[in-house]
Amino acid sequence: MAYRESYAGKINRKLNKKLHVVEVASGRQKADLVLKNATYVNVFCNELSHGDIAVAEGLIAGMGEHYEGEVEIDMSGKLVLPGFVDAHIHLESALVSPKEFANAVIPHGTTTVITDPHEIANVMGTDGIEYMLQATEDLPVDVRFMLPSCVPATPLDESGAVLDYRAIDSFYEHNRVEGLAEMMNYVGVANADEQVLEKIVAAQAHHKKIDGHAPGLSGNDLNAYIAAGVYSDHECSTVEDAIAKLERGQYIMIREGTAARNLDALLPLLTPQYYTYCMFCTDDKHPNDLLEKGHIDYIVRRAIKAGVDPIIAVKCASHHAARYFLLNNRGAIAPGFLADFVVIDNFDDFNILEVYKKGKLMFDGKTVTPFDAPEIDPHLAKRSHETFHVAHLEATDFIESRPRAVLGMVPGEIVTTDAGYAEKISVEDDILKIAVIERHKNTHHIGIGYIKGYGLKSGAVATSISHDSHNIIVVGANEEDMAAAVNRVVELGGGIVVMDDGKVLGELQLQIAGIMSEAPLIEVNEALENAKEQAFKLGVSRGVDPFMTLSFMALTVIPTLRLTTRGVFDVINQRYV
């Protein structure tokens, strides 16, 4: 009986709101807010429309003339756009808490993001997913989730958890979970691997979306991948790859982030022939990029300056992602849609003047309206600060008795070459030692190799951001500083450390699972930029991002050589060398 009463109460509350919205829409009651004399993007007719926009209960009640509101704001001379949607991002890549991320992107017009929490899931397993769900509850940026499909990324990785479909299945019942995130194991899908396909089948059983990750996949393998139920991809770097997928019914997420930038290459898609199934995403967005360039607004601005029709750019930044994810109450300015607005001066300058979330002003052109961080279960908060299980290391732990393979770095890329073998560090020849230390289960596993092209002349650089399992990775010109740098990362509870002659020259603490900081974004960026500068002073090549590049050296899905906790792995030939 209690359930029936609770249900009846819920219906009554919703009915009262609906009555208010309908009364406002019909003009019989005043709106909560009216944007007067607005010129707005009509995503349905591909044109600019004009009139008042009436808001009630956080929804758009109507557009037209002569609406009255408790609050009325004149929009003459401005443009009103739907709130922006990032179709695919890993929030952890910003290195800050979800609250800090929201605070950073609101001024850029972002009102919804679709996140894949696979970074923290690789460290904390299902506790990591639950942590992120709690940390994003009721933020002024609506955070929706796609569940990680590949934890760990490959069987070679020693991650903090192994998640099969059973482990994540209950999360599909959460009202902000939209589906299964990027299916990186496209080989497993194409080869009909049952353990891979059961994850897709489980998501489909819950009527959820499955996102893709299949760079360069073509022919029958691509057919098999899509036939399995994967209907989007964000890994296209060429128009040819994208069109092959569009022809087969996939949506294309045009990515312009920090680690990968594909907008310029994919601009030909933003034409009437192809744009209908395209949307924008960032994938990874680092602090400096967020502060200096922005978020989805940066992609829209760039596209318009490149000659793309502004309405096409706006639709790819809002309506298309909402439609793909079946978020049918956002991404447009129309009756019944969420009152998520971005107000700009004009398409040419594209300065964001105001941002509204559910009809509430969240950015006034200068400051973000303050909001509280969500409460996180104390057990989860404590767990997120206790993710390092590593013994104290000595220089001797990095001494090896035989030649090891050399990872050859490629300028501006995260792929590597096979650069032969080395027996010792040779700073003169730019041969440095690199190691990956398992940090989740205290296995004492340390994989050792060499790397060429990093440029370090002295000291060591260590980080607990090491895709995708986030063990500790370190590069050094001597074993003593390598050990000291790793030990300092552990002392911090996670972070980035630049060490020379036993002294810390720069560091950034990442105490949330070893991959995110609790500090404000500006402070994180300052610490990160200082650490970068110290790494450059120690000789790291200026064309190399000292930490981002290093963080990908352990990802065993990218050719040619990678380093795991068990040694150097040849991705092409699928064997240790």
Name these PLM-found stretches:
Residues 65, 124-128, 154-160, 191-195, ...:
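Short acidic, glycine/serine/threonine-rich loops at helix termini
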Residues 1-51, 55-56, 65, 106-108, ...:
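Active-site microenvironment of metallo-dependent hydrolases
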Residues 86-97, 152-163, 231:
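Active-site mouth loops of central-metabolism enzymes
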Residues 2-24, 102-207, 273, 504-509:
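Divalent-metal coordination cores built from histidine and acidic residues
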Residues 38, 58, 77, 88, ...:
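Divalent metal-coordination and catalytic microenvironments
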Residues 90-94, 118-120, 148-153, 183-186, ...:
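Active-site beta-loop-alpha junctions enriched in small/polar residues
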Residues 162-182, 188-253, 260-280, 291-305, ...:
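Histidine/acidic residue-rich metal-binding segments in metalloenzymes
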